Amino acid sequence: MRIIKCLDQIFRPVLPNVNINNIQKNKKINILYFIDVSKFHVFEQLLLEESLFRISNNTTEGLNNIGFVIVNNTCEEMNESKGNECIFNNKKCVILGISNKIKDHIKDTNYIKENKISLIKRFTGGGTIYINKNSLLVSLILPHKFEKNKKIYPSNITEWSYNYFYNTSKQIYDKTQINNEKNSLNKNHILFNQYFNYYENDYVYKDYDEHNKNIILKKVGGNAQSFARNYFVHHTSYIWTCDYKEMNNILLNPSKQPIYRNKRKHQHFLQSIKLCLHDDIHTPNIFIEKLIKHIKHIINYKNITDQHDYWFFNKINLKNINDHILRNSEHFDDIYVADMNLLQCIFNYYNNSSLFNNMRSTYFLDLEGKKVSDRYYDIPTYFL
């Protein structure tokens, strides 16, 4: 395992252990990084994602392309401290899309204050979500060149991510036709069952009601994205558990909503992703393990079919954060180790550099919707 100490090692990577003989010489070498931030508060996750997205967009053009898959299991319980870990006893927060207003989405600001719920404005579009140990977050930060066969827009990115990253049942039949031995997708890599689908810009539970002769559509995952010249970010919040009473106390039924919602109340519109998962996925951590396996097969397939690019799938373990360093290690081409100083450098470079002046869009908000300092809410942090 290599230790990453500076920004260049991520954004302009050198690969000393690469066997060039195994790669066609005319192929450009790229890296897709996997980072698990399950012990982070969502606020720091969003700051990290925004920093990686903007820095990648500005610094990797014409050089090695890089990308990131970032996961956060907010359901994970942490009852004790190990080393320098921060323990978040209160991760409750409402996250608003970049254009959303508190008055249009928050039902009762007094309830927010009394229950010590933090308010966050994120750097991407989309709707408003409530996080309280109830969601599995998956983010993709990728160069536009990652997808060679079609142009990705905000209007089609959910369809693309569904078909490319998540529709594993379809890919079993499509990809193994090319090379069964090198591309051995099997049932161990299936993430979802037949009820998982997409509709408009959401991931949904889709079924047919035989009695009433109508299609049932319930939201199981919300998506948001941001596009820049060279990169896009697409993140998903999968609903693991639904506390409808708490949602009703906090979130309004928004005036701007997808057509298929049809003004349904939260309890009639939102559904746990668990109804859409393959039979052997019982926990968010198992989902993450399956996702890692599946992404590795996606990269293998991409390397077989892409004549110009070769992608490595590497993991960045965060020192004192990722306890199980060797978990799923066989699915990564390489594993790096980094400490919080590196993340702090990444954020500070983005937050303070003149290259990104006034670009930052992720902030804490007060009850009136005004931007406040990163220390406004009393939560422990890793790199702020």
UniProtKB/Swiss-Prot annotation:
It comes from the Eukaryota. GO terms for molecular function: lipoate-protein ligase activity. Keywords: Apicoplast, Mitochondrion, Plastid, Transit peptide. This is Inactive lipoate--protein ligase 2. One of its GO terms (biological process) is protein modification process. Residues 79-303 form the BPL/LPL catalytic domain. It is found in: Mitochondrion; Plastid, Apicoplast. The keyword Phosphoprotein does not apply. The keyword Coiled coil does not apply. One of its GO terms (cellular component) is mitochondrion. In the mitochondrion and together with LipL1, involved in the lipoylation of the E2 component of the branched chain alpha-ketoacid dehydrogenase complex BCKDH-E2/BCDH and the E2 component of the alpha -ketoglutarate dehydrogenase complex KDH. LipL1 is responsible for catalysing the activation of lipoate, forming lipoyl-AMP while LipL2 is required but is not capable of catalyzing this reaction. Although its role is unclear, it may catalyze the transfer of lipoyl groups from lipoyl-AMP to BCDH and KDH or act as an effector protein. It comes from Plasmodium falciparum (isolate 3D7). Transmembrane segments: none annotated.
